[in-house]
Amino acid sequence: MLGVKDKGILLQIIKRCNRVIEKVSNISETEFSLNEDSKEVVCFNLFQIGGLANGLSVEFIKEYNKIPWKQIIGMRNRIVHGYDTINFEIVWRTAIESIPELKSYCKEILG
């Protein structure tokens, strides 16, 4: 059973996913790499998603393990503690490939 807290977190994750998708949907990887605003917005929202994922219950993470929640949390930590050394190619791939998948899975869980 999905708890109220986990449900609220999923709704916030979806909101953050939407922001990332919106920011990268009409630009190329090159445009992204040259646009500091886009990189900052995407990284901020990835940071937020990781923080939210860290608040999910242990039971939730065990039950809904199709997504690598620990990697999401790890990316958040990498952004927070190593912003100057972030590989923006990885950030781009995450934004283009993983974030839509995460959004879809969260929506699936919520029904």
Task: Label the predicted regions.
Residues 1-111:
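Solvent-exposed interaction patches of small proteins and small membrane subunits
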